[in-house]
Amino acid sequence: MISFGNVSALQAAMPQARNEILNEGKLSIGGKEYTINAATQEFTRANPTSGAVARFFEATGKLFREGSTQSVAKAITKAVFDNEQGQAQRLQTSSSVEHGQMLFKDANLKTPSDVLNAFAKLDSKMVKSHAAELSQLAERAMTEVMLETDSGKNLKALIGDDAVKSLAVRVVKDYGGGVAAAQKNPEVRINQMQAVFDMEVMHLKAAQRHIEGLASTDLNQGVYAEGLPEDAFNKAGVTNNVERAAAWIINASNSKGNDAENITSLLKEYATNGKDLLNMDNLKELHARLVPNVERDYRGPNISGGTLPSSIGGEGMLKQHIEGFLKENPVADKDLGKHLFAGVIGYHGFTDGNGRMGRMLYAIAELRNDSFNPLAMNAENSLHGIK
């Protein structure tokens, strides 16, 4: 067994002796054995002397020599676990409960809500010395709580497990309030974030009803068939369908610096390369080439009166739409472009360039059918349904 005469000797041996102590699972200080409780990252006195009288004299002698058994155990715990290596181990745990049990030294924490409630007991010294880790733990626990709410479960049913987890992390970071909120009243923040999730569900379901409803609609008549006059977008009077499509995409975009050469090149390539347009990875690849250097990687849920969902929720719905709904409910080749246009813009699954991407896919589908019919604004609005 690894042995030290006193706590000071242990402290002097750190951090070199740390791994050996962890592998051993125990150590001796002043002739007394202490074992590791892995669940709480702490040491406890092992095999105390039997008999009440003997334990009394042991404790009394220990107290006079170097403090109580409990204080020695705390000092060992601090030396071995209150460092970067101990923090790294805590951050690698699989849940906020495991993390919280280790950081707060409390095996009675059984749920993420228990972890959040434990923040109320923190003193200012602990908050200051472990600020970054406490912030991560608070966000982690709030995220796990959110996923178990009815709002979280409803959102998961729409966009899937991975997407709802990603969105929960972002929402908690934006609205959770961190350590201060966890200390004060985490339930208030949880309720507020549930309202954000509920708005997201409402927007996604509204988009889903509209977009999937197009599958039972004749898109070759009425407003859906309205075309844009040639002179409204084709100022140069080009006659090649690829060039006409490029002119239409550029004319409709509000973004500055559209690369006409790049758009034309992509149209030529995808018109003949046969890549599956009902594959999300293929769409992401095309989007990255069409809209390079996107400045942001996330658009949050709309809570200020608009109807757009978050980019994460929108992407999740778009993936399910093209890889699930449209494959299970196939549409005519001549209508595929309109359905892709509606899905990309209606769900708004990219952080930027949704309009360009929707028009690009519409144009590619048209070109694969050896035609190009430019959509009028009324047709576009009726297809994507965004108010």
From Swiss-Prot:
**Function in brief:** Adenylyltransferase involved in virulence by mediating the addition of adenosine 5'-monophosphate (AMP) to specific threonine residue of host Rho GTPases RhoA, Rac and Cdc42. The resulting AMPylation prevents the interaction of Rho GTPases with downstream effectors, thereby inhibiting actin assembly in infected cells.
UniProt remark on domains? The fido domain mediates the adenylyltransferase activity.
Which protein is depicted? Protein adenylyltransferase VopS
> Which GO terms are recorded in the biological process aspect for this UniProt protein?
symbiont-mediated perturbation of host small GTPase-mediated signal transduction
Recorded consequence of changing residue 308 to A: Slight reduction in adenylyltransferase activity
Binding-site residues for ATP, renumbered to this chain: 76-77, 122-124, 353-355, 359
Domain of life from the UniProt record: Bacteria
Localisation = Secreted
The EC code for this enzyme is 2.7.7.108
Give start and end of each Fido domain: 278-387
GO CC, alphabetical:
extracellular region
Q: Which InterPro entries match?
A: Fido, Fido-like_dom_sf, VopS_N
Q: What general EC class does the enzyme of this chain belong to?
A: transferase
Which Pfam families does the record cross-reference, listed alphabetically? Answer: Fic, VopS_N
Keywords for the protein's UniProt record, in alphabetical order = ATP-binding, Nucleotide-binding, Nucleotidyltransferase, Secreted, Transferase, Virulence
The entry lists its GO molecular-function terms as: AMPylase activity; ATP binding; small GTPase binding
